[in-house]
Curated annotation (Swiss-Prot):
Organism: Synechococcus sp. (strain CC9902)
Family note: Belongs to the universal ribosomal protein uS13 family.
Protein name: Small ribosomal subunit protein uS13
Pfam families in the record: Ribosomal_S13
NCBIfam families: uS13_bact (TIGR03631)
Single GO cellular component term: small ribosomal subunit
Example GO molecular function: structural constituent of ribosome
UniProt feature, compositional bias: Basic residues: 100-121
Source species, domain of life: Bacteria
Gene that produces this protein: rpsM
Subunit structure: Part of the 30S ribosomal subunit. Forms a loose heterodimer with protein S19. Forms two bridges to the 50S subunit in the 70S ribosome.
GO biological process, one term: translation
Keyword Isomerase: no
Length: 121
Protein backbone atom coordinates (compact mmCIF):
# COMPACT_ATOMS: atom_id res chain seq x y z
CA UNK A 1 0.00 0.00 0.00
CA UNK A 2 1.16 3.50 -0.77
CA UNK A 3 1.21 5.83 2.21
CA UNK A 4 0.22 9.44 1.61
CA UNK A 5 -0.40 11.95 4.42
CA UNK A 6 -0.17 9.15 6.99
CA UNK A 7 -2.93 7.11 5.34
CA UNK A 8 -2.52 3.78 3.58
CA UNK A 9 -4.44 4.18 0.33
CA UNK A 10 -5.88 1.06 -1.38
CA UNK A 11 -3.59 -0.44 -4.03
CA UNK A 12 -6.16 -1.99 -6.35
CA UNK A 13 -8.28 1.11 -6.93
CA UNK A 14 -7.65 3.96 -9.36
CA UNK A 15 -5.48 6.75 -7.95
CA UNK A 16 -8.35 9.23 -8.29
CA UNK A 17 -10.57 7.12 -6.00
CA UNK A 18 -7.78 6.03 -3.65
CA UNK A 19 -6.93 9.64 -2.76
CA UNK A 20 -10.48 10.11 -1.46
CA UNK A 21 -9.63 7.75 1.43
CA UNK A 22 -7.68 10.67 2.92
CA UNK A 23 -9.87 12.80 5.21
CA UNK A 24 -10.37 16.19 3.57
CA UNK A 25 -9.88 15.02 -0.02
CA UNK A 26 -12.96 14.39 -2.13
CA UNK A 27 -13.18 13.52 -5.81
CA UNK A 28 -12.86 17.12 -7.03
CA UNK A 29 -9.80 17.83 -4.89
CA UNK A 30 -8.28 14.47 -5.89
CA UNK A 31 -8.59 15.44 -9.56
CA UNK A 32 -6.93 18.80 -8.84
CA UNK A 33 -4.05 17.08 -6.99
CA UNK A 34 -3.52 14.64 -9.86
CA UNK A 35 -3.53 17.46 -12.41
CA UNK A 36 -1.00 19.43 -10.35
CA UNK A 37 1.24 16.37 -9.92
CA UNK A 38 0.86 15.38 -13.57
CA UNK A 39 -0.28 11.83 -12.79
CA UNK A 40 -2.76 9.91 -14.94
CA UNK A 41 -5.99 9.52 -12.88
CA UNK A 42 -6.93 6.21 -14.54
CA UNK A 43 -3.82 4.33 -13.41
CA UNK A 44 -4.01 1.95 -10.43
CA UNK A 45 -2.08 2.75 -7.25
CA UNK A 46 -0.07 -0.49 -7.50
CA UNK A 47 1.21 0.63 -10.93
CA UNK A 48 2.48 4.00 -9.66
CA UNK A 49 6.21 4.62 -9.60
CA UNK A 50 8.00 6.00 -6.56
CA UNK A 51 8.46 9.35 -8.30
CA UNK A 52 4.71 9.65 -8.88
CA UNK A 53 3.99 8.91 -5.21
CA UNK A 54 6.47 11.59 -4.17
CA UNK A 55 4.74 14.08 -6.50
CA UNK A 56 1.37 13.21 -4.96
CA UNK A 57 2.76 13.66 -1.43
CA UNK A 58 4.07 17.10 -2.41
CA UNK A 59 0.76 18.10 -4.01
CA UNK A 60 -1.29 17.05 -0.96
CA UNK A 61 0.86 19.13 1.40
CA UNK A 62 -0.77 22.29 0.00
CA UNK A 63 -4.09 21.30 1.59
CA UNK A 64 -5.24 21.02 5.20
CA UNK A 65 -6.04 17.33 5.58
CA UNK A 66 -6.33 14.50 8.11
CA UNK A 67 -5.46 15.35 11.73
CA UNK A 68 -4.95 19.08 11.13
CA UNK A 69 -8.38 19.38 9.50
CA UNK A 70 -10.10 17.36 12.24
CA UNK A 71 -8.43 19.53 14.90
CA UNK A 72 -9.42 22.72 13.05
CA UNK A 73 -13.07 21.62 12.84
CA UNK A 74 -13.12 20.58 16.49
CA UNK A 75 -11.66 23.92 17.57
CA UNK A 76 -14.25 25.79 15.50
CA UNK A 77 -17.06 23.93 17.31
CA UNK A 78 -15.41 24.47 20.69
CA UNK A 79 -15.12 28.20 19.97
CA UNK A 80 -18.84 28.40 19.18
CA UNK A 81 -19.64 26.60 22.43
CA UNK A 82 -17.27 28.76 24.49
CA UNK A 83 -18.71 32.07 23.30
CA UNK A 84 -22.21 30.76 24.07
CA UNK A 85 -23.82 31.61 20.75
CA UNK A 86 -26.98 29.84 19.60
CA UNK A 87 -25.08 27.52 17.25
CA UNK A 88 -22.71 26.53 20.05
CA UNK A 89 -25.55 25.82 22.47
CA UNK A 90 -27.40 23.72 19.86
CA UNK A 91 -24.22 21.71 19.24
CA UNK A 92 -23.78 21.16 22.98
CA UNK A 93 -27.40 19.96 23.36
CA UNK A 94 -27.12 17.69 20.28
CA UNK A 95 -29.96 19.45 18.50
CA UNK A 96 -30.17 20.57 14.86
CA UNK A 97 -28.12 23.73 14.40
CA UNK A 98 -29.51 25.24 11.22
CA UNK A 99 -33.08 26.03 12.15
CA UNK A 100 -34.77 22.72 11.41
CA UNK A 101 -37.90 21.76 13.30
CA UNK A 102 -37.57 19.54 16.36
CA UNK A 103 -41.13 18.99 17.54
CA UNK A 104 -41.26 16.09 15.12
CA UNK A 105 -38.37 14.61 13.15
CA UNK A 106 -34.72 15.40 14.02
CA UNK A 107 -34.44 11.79 15.28
CA UNK A 108 -30.93 11.28 13.95
CA UNK A 109 -29.55 14.28 15.79
CA UNK A 110 -31.55 13.81 19.01
CA UNK A 111 -31.04 10.04 19.25
CA UNK A 112 -33.52 7.29 20.02
CA UNK A 113 -36.81 8.13 21.73
CA UNK A 114 -36.82 8.33 25.50
CA UNK A 115 -40.18 7.08 26.72
CA UNK A 116 -41.78 9.13 29.47
CA UNK A 117 -44.09 7.18 31.79
CA UNK A 118 -47.73 8.12 31.31
CA UNK A 119 -50.24 8.90 34.04
CA UNK A 120 -51.93 5.77 35.46
CA UNK A 121 -55.72 5.69 35.64
Amino acid sequence: MARIAGVDIPRDKRVEVSLTYIYGIGLTRAKAILAKAGVNPDIRVKDLEDGDIQKLRGATEAFTIEGDLRRQEGMALKRLQDIGCVRGRRHRMSLPVRGQRTRTNARTRRGARKTVAGKKK
